[in-house]
Amino acid sequence: MANLSRLFSVKIGRQTTAAQYGVFGVGIILAPGAAFFGLKYSTYESAKIENFNDLYRVYTSADDAASDGMSGDNLLAVQAYFSQSPSPDTLVVGDFSAAYSKTMIRLTGVPVAGAPAAIKATIGYVKGSEYRYAKFNGTAWSGSAGATADIVADSGAEGQFLVDGRIVYLEGAEVVHKSSVVLSAAVSQAIAAIKNQYNRFFMSMTTSRDLSIQKAIADWTESQIDKMAVFIDDYSSPTWATDSITKYIHDKNMAGSFAVSTKREKNFLDAALAGRCLVMQPGSETWALKTLNAAQADDFTETDYQKIQALNGNTFEDYGSGITVTYPGTCGDGESIEVVRFCYWQADRMQKDLATLFVNRNKIGHDMPGYEVVCNKMESSLKAGQTAGGIIENFTDENGDLIRGFEVVRPTMAEVSATQRIKGDLTVKFKFYLRYAIKHVDAIGSAMTYGI
């Protein structure tokens, strides 16, 4: 039988490849001693070293984190993130244990689930290439080989112990971040290791208030083109005016990081603010004037506030009349948080739109029709930014001239060199006007007497 293709040949090529857009609405909590591997009293002694290769977990609720074994400050930060309204969909928790060379733990008095009453605490940790475990009977630790030497009582505080290892399971005790031994030189490598395993996060925060760790995270963040970081700034520190994370990111003119000051312990304003604002489309929001759940407002004096504002810091305060909000919503360099986030988003959007355009075309000519195709796609990306609220709408100025929110400048054939054409290179210039948010209003009026 003859092949029908001799008469009617039909071939279909699928041009359906799409570049994936970046993630700009997911936070990550860098949690030393995260202990999120789901171990229990009945299983912690039989765990294997290969069970702990993952450095991250993705959560959709705080209950899931608690079920996995997270506790203490790490769990409080997760709860603050998910307590906002509307509640965020996703949170990443990174095992940031590499930032500590030794981790301090403190007995909580909470019973170990499923254990005899005599067992006051249990722990599992990784040291080198070994998994070790131990239990505490109220007097001493006992467990696998080497465990008793790895867990040393803190002479300065009863019920505290310094653990030499990466904690992967902990019950009956919690991590004490401020008393742990910091290894700030390992911070960048620790974040990079988490990122290499899972990169679908945007805004970093940490449960540690150690300044050297915060500075290292800020330095790493500033080197990224698609990441931001928020920090808790301990305003109660006696060295705040001369050495604080707010001052550090201000003095280094950092655009990718910002800090929220508080005098309260266990007040995770960073996680709360991230959870409140990351749910909003980049460009549609402001990070100022936001109410927060699961967070405590500070009672700063006007002098306190002016000191913080002078360093482009942020606060969460009670203004009376039921208004308890964040302010002013600025990064270390003084730019609005939402503007930095939007610009990262807009750059990613245009890059990925152009990539999708080119990989699905057999050829885009290096001529005026080809330039028009490229410019149209760039305008489409900018229009998406305008629709999102990050670029101002077109308007008519006082002279009656139309001012466009964005403009893509078409290159001419004469402007493109032969070398560019041979190499396939093309430069297209564009500009847009940012749509800033109103955060402060001065209403000035006059009270008059009729008849005068």
Q: What kind of feature is each model-predicted range?
A:
Residues M1-I452:
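Surface-exposed assembly/interface segments
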